[in-house]
A protein has these predicted regions:
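Beta-lactamase-like hydrolase cores
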Residues: 323-355, 371
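A short acidic/glycine-rich loop-to-helix N-cap element
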Residues: 651-660
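Short, gly/Ser/Thr-rich active-site loops of penicillin-recognizing serine hydrolases
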Residues: 561, 662-686
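Beta-lactam-recognizing serine transpeptidase/beta-lactamase-like catalytic domain environment
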Residues: 71, 77, 291-310, 317, ...
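A generic structural motif
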Residues: 84-85, 648-652
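Membrane-proximal periplasmic segments of bacterial cell-envelope enzymes
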Residues: 1-306, 339-352, 358
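Solvent-exposed, polar/charged alpha-helical surfaces in well-ordered, non-transmembrane soluble domains
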Residues: 89-100, 199, 207, 211, ...
Length: 686
């Protein structure tokens, strides 16, 4: 028998009632959430924090006159700590694990804390020594720890252990982790600032950290642009170096670097062109925005500003020619060491060569010996700093040398242009020259008796220049020397020593120094780059260009030339008496009279010098001074292209280093098959 429809009615009513109750409860809950607690949950939903991180721009390149890279960038990897990603991981334990990975791979880590590892008794010592940066760093650490500046190393380490909760680690690990934590503090590690634990890490470290990423929260492998030098032996002193910002740089001028957009762990040019053109090379950093909610969950991450690479700095230097000039200098020094007797060049051990484009003042090459490999600079700095003679000194721009007889053309120019002598007037070369009670002599090589200026330069007659110098006057020939380029700033971009001339204000001045200074002795000290500028000015018949090595700047992205550096005339000496012609004839004669340059296929102009050093050898009547060697040269005389200056310490005299000039001329004028170069060094290819 079938049920009647009315038998189902109670069930339907019950279901409707239950559904109504559920609906009412849902609506009440919705009202509660939306109306009563709405503001609370709205605030919670909006409780996110936005963080911005720098994306470092690629550094601009430095290239030679043909566009060949001298300083460039390669892709590398850094190990970075990101506090946003650390989560609940213990920072100290994470750092310990990462250091163990770095140690296994032979990688170093970022810790400049000047405190030693514990000794056998568990004591520590400071390692700051005479290093100002380390001393400043140590002072900052003590201040941060609330210690007095006289606190001992043990007291500092105790404070570090307490502050960074390192009590449960062994002493060796307390030092390692404490040093890293101090470094992190000094670099403002926080949710807003990442910390670079290690730079340029090995592939092994990269792989290991990635494999263990789940247990190493907060540790990130970051691809980065790293500075590299295709041939680190080319222009190391000039290119300079980059390094992390030092704390004293960071706090200087009320944190000026921060206002310019730097982060404390950024790289910055430390020396050379890298420092001088930091603003052009650095580029514009980009920006990464990370949004994190109140539970610490990353909600979004996006690049909001793309980084823009720095500009390319173009030089006047020809990298291949530079290598040949460097080789010419080194080979000559080694040859002198191996072939010359003691006291006559065997002791040669250091020097410099500078080669200029006569028509522009652009530096085509600048070599210093001894030198170093820029790619190994950081790793070998301590050894380099301890060597004598120092490879770190840029002798071409900062080495100060007595010019000796290479100074005589300046005295000749002063005498001729001031009417004290003429191209044909003579001085009687008879020993000794008498100036009050001072009686210097002349070696009289190849001459004696009456001699005019051109032959006096050819044979390097001392008495001619004693007399001309005295009659012209110290101040007058000094002024001429400076107009020609000696003992003044030449204009080279990376910094240079000014040097000095002998003056009446010198503490040791006596009237005899007027005589000695006229042959480039006394107190006069100049640099090789000044000597090259001086030679170029003589080649240009009195027109002195500003010496420079930067040719211009180029947009790295588009290749567009942004700026070119045009030749600048610094001085023009008016010559209505044929002074520079007479000087040139004398220097041509000197080239013919010097064995190494006597048969050169082009007509070249040369003046050597053999300035005496203060050091002596021998005893009694056999006592004598050691000599440096100096040479200035230019050529071809008919249409001068390049000017050369070379100085070699302890080389025994200018004639001993004249081969350097020959080798440099050969490298410029001829290719390796001894054929005439169709493309001269320093000439941009079309």
């Amino acid at each position: 028998m079938k049920n009647k429809p009315e038998d189902h009615q109670p069930r339907v009513v019950l279901m409707i009632a239950l559904a109504s109750v559920v609906l009412v409860l849902f609506l009440l809950r919705l009202v509660y959430l939306q109306v009563i607690e709405g503001n609370h949950y709205l605030e919670q939903a909006d409780n996110t924090t936005s963080y911005r991180f720098n994306i470092t721009a690629a550094r601009g390149e430095i290239v030679d006159c043909y566009g060949r890279s001298l300083a460039t960038n390669t892709t590398g990897y850094n190990l970075v700590m990101n506090n946003l990603m650390l989560g609940d991981n213990d920072l100290n334990d994470t750092l310990k694990t990462l250091v163990e990975i770095l140690q296994t791979s032979g990688d170093s880590w970022n810790d400049a804390t000047p405190i030693s590892s514990p000794d056998a008794d568990g004591h520590y010592s400071f390692t700051d020594g005479d290093n100002t940066s380390d001393q400043n760093r140590l002072a900052a650490i003590k201040t941060n720890l609330g210690l007095q500046q006289y606190a001992t190393a043990d007291e500092v380490m105790s404070a570090i252990v307490a502050k960074y909760e390192l009590e449960n680690y062994e002493p060796a690990w307390q030092r390692i982790l404490g040093g890293i934590r101090c470094q992190m503090t000094s670099e403002d590690y926080s949710n807003y600032t990442n910390f670079t634990l290690a730079t340029g890490i090995s592939d092994r470290t990269v792989a290991t950290v990635k494999e263990r990423s789940l247990s190493l929260a907060g540790a990130e492998i970051v691809e980065t642009s790293m500075r590299s030098y295709p041939d680190g032996t080319v222009l190391p002193h000039v290119l300079g170096s980059v390094g992390k910002i030092l704390r004293e740089q960071w706090v200087a001028d009320d944190y000026a670097l921060r206002r310019k957009g730097y982060a404390m762990n950024d790289l910055i040019g430390r020396s050379g062109l890298e420092a001088v053109y930091e603003d052009r090379l650095r580029g514009q950093d980009g920006s990464l925005q990370v949004v994190k909610d109140s539970d610490g969950v990353i909600q979004s991450s996006q690049v909001v500003e793309k980084p823009q690479p720095g500009q390319t700095v173009m030089l006047t230097v020809d990298a291949d020619f530079q290598k040949e000039v460097q080789a010419a200098l080194e080979n000559r020094i080694l040859t002198l060491q191996q072939t010359k007797p003691a006291h006559s060049g065997q002791e040669a051990n250091a020097g410099a060569v500078v080669v200029l484009d006569v028509k522009t003042g652009g530096i085509l090459a600048t070599a210093t010996y001894p030198t170093y490999d820029l790619n190994q600079y950081s790793a070998t700095y301590s050894d380099l700093a301890a060597q004598d003679p120092s490879p770190l000194l840029n002798r071409a721009f900062n080495g100060l040398y007595t010019p000796g007889s290479s100074f005589k053309p300046a005295v000749a120019a002063a005498g001729l242009l001031n009417g004290v002598i003429t191209p044909t007037s003579t001085v009687n070369c008879v020993n000794p020259y008498v100036y009050y009670d001072y009686r210097p002599t002349c070696l009289q090589h190849g001459h004696s008796g009456p001699i005019a200026v051109s032959d006096a330069l050819k044979y390097s007659c001392n008495i001619f220049f004693y007399d001309t110098g005295v009659r012209t006057g110290l101040e007058t020939y000094n002024a001429m020397a400076q107009r020609l380029g000696l003992a003044v700033q030449t204009g080279v971009e990376v910094g240079e020593s000014t040097g000095w001339l002998t003056t009446p204000q010198d503490e040791n001045f006596t009237s005899s120094l007027i005589v000695q200074a006229a042959i480039g002795q006394a107190n006069t000290m100049v640099t090789p780059v000044q000597l090259a500028t001086y030679a170029a000015t003589i080649a240009n018949k009195g027109v002195r260009y500003r010496t420079h090595m930067v040719a211009g700047f180029r947009d790295t992205n588009t290749g567009e030339i942004l700026e070119t550096v045009d030749p600048v005339v610094e001085d023009t000496i008016v010559d209505n008496v044929g002074a520079f012609d007479a000087i040139e004839q004398g220097m041509i004669g000197a080239a013919k009279y010097t064995s190494a340059t006597s048969n050169y296929p082009y007509t070249i102009a040369v003046k050597t010098g053999s300035p005496q050093r203060a050091e002596t050898y021998g005893t009694g009547r056999g006592r004598a001074n050691y000599n440096n060697g100096v040479i200035v040269a230019y050529g071809p005389v008919e249409d001068p292209q390049i000017a050369i200056a070379a100085v070699v310490e302890w080389s025994g005299g200018g004639s001993n280093i004249a081969q350097i000039a020959v080798d440099v001329f050969n490298a410029y004028f001829f290719d390796q098959s001894n054929s005439l170069n169709s493309q001269a060094a320093g000439t941009l290819l079309p």
